Amino acid sequence: MDSISVTNAKFCFDVFNEMKVHHVNENILYCPLSILTALAMVYLGARGNTESQMKKVLHFDSITGAGSTTDSQCGSSEYVHNLFKELLSEITRPNATYSLEIADKLYVDKTFSVLPEYLSCARKFYTGGVEEVNFKTAAEEARQLINSWVEKETNGQIKDLLVSSSIDFGTTMVFINTIYFKGIWKIAFNTEDTREMPFSMTKEESKPVQMMCMNNSFNVATLPAEKMKILELPYASGDLSMLVLLPDEVSGLERIEKTINFDKLREWTSTNAMAKKSMKVYLPRMKIEEKYNLTSILMALGMTDLFSRSANLTGISSVDNLMISDAVHGVFMEVNEEGTEATGSTGAIGNIKHSLELEEFRADHPFLFFIRYNPTNAILFFGRYWSP
């Protein structure tokens, strides 16, 4: 696992530990890597205590080689920004089997003139960059401009990211971070096998869901001590996989959420733990869109200066009092039957009906899932599916 992927995984669970407190019994979906990238772009211009807090919360202090370049135009953290640039260009390169759009942008009020050195370094490493807008006298126009940029960047899937009250004349800087994902499975689910089935949120409460079904060989970990199974579903390119962490019992998710962390996940999904098995898999069709204001989460993790008058962002603008007013994360992901290889047509229906001897992986109650970039083990998405 490379150093950025480790940093990303640690940050992923820090965020999850905060999110699960604020989103009890709800679906959760976020992209730790894109949040980290957007914050790295801010970190480029952070100085003093603000920089120290960010370095700690983002786990940049654990990256080997970080801080080794001191003569660079873009500061001592150039090594870290280069790692992000390499990983992001690898993951988002044009690919016929999945669509992944990560969009990060800093919107700064025009009264804080952005330093040309910062602009040039932000452009060097990050695609989104910085845009100056007029929050003070045209806040509503700025909000609409940001929303239309987000909609365009996410293929029209994320609309109205910023609600009408979120921007006002006191806003100084907003960081926007959105991600859209649609993947194609290595092996397709047959649409004819998809059925409406109950999805149990609790022992007493259930909702109908369109449940996809397939018989095939998958990597599976059976973990009796954790009362859980983990299934790996590969996407077509082989570069990405979805891993589903399914508790044995309907009410078993809380137990997993209490114990999960970076080291545990690495242990549970290691090659020693997972083995190829013929399985009968049931997985809900999912379309998840989530929007989060990350300000309170990041402050709870220890990044307090950035969102207050104590912020030192003199690497972005020499004008005093520049701070982040809002940090907004929008994410859209769709999971359906599409794949590159058919599972067989009429034969597969027969298989589904007459496969009682196969071990089942039936995701018909709350579970955790994540999408992994296999070459580096980076976690792209992390989520909880609680309810259809």
Swiss-Prot record:
Glycosylation sites: 95, 215, 293, 312
PTM note: N-glycosylated on at least two Asn residues by ovomucoid type carbohydrate units. The N-terminus is blocked.
Residues at the site labelled Reactive bond homolog: 353-354
Gene Ontology CC annotation, any one: extracellular space
Pfam families in UniProt: Serpin
Tissue: Major protein of egg white. Expressed in the magnum of the oviduct (at protein level).
Predominant place of localization: secreted
Taxonomic superkingdom: Eukaryota
Disulphide bridges, residue numbers: 74-121
Localization (cell): Secreted
A single GO molecular function term of this UniProt record: serine-type endopeptidase inhibitor activity
Factors inducing expression: Down-regulated by dietary stress. Decreased expression at day 14 in the magnum of the oviduct in the corticosterone-fed laying hens.
UniProt keyword list: Disulfide bond, Glycoprotein, Proteoglycan, Secreted
Record-stated family: Belongs to the serpin family. Ov-serpin subfamily.
Protein name: Ovalbumin-related protein Y
Source organism per UniProt: Gallus gallus
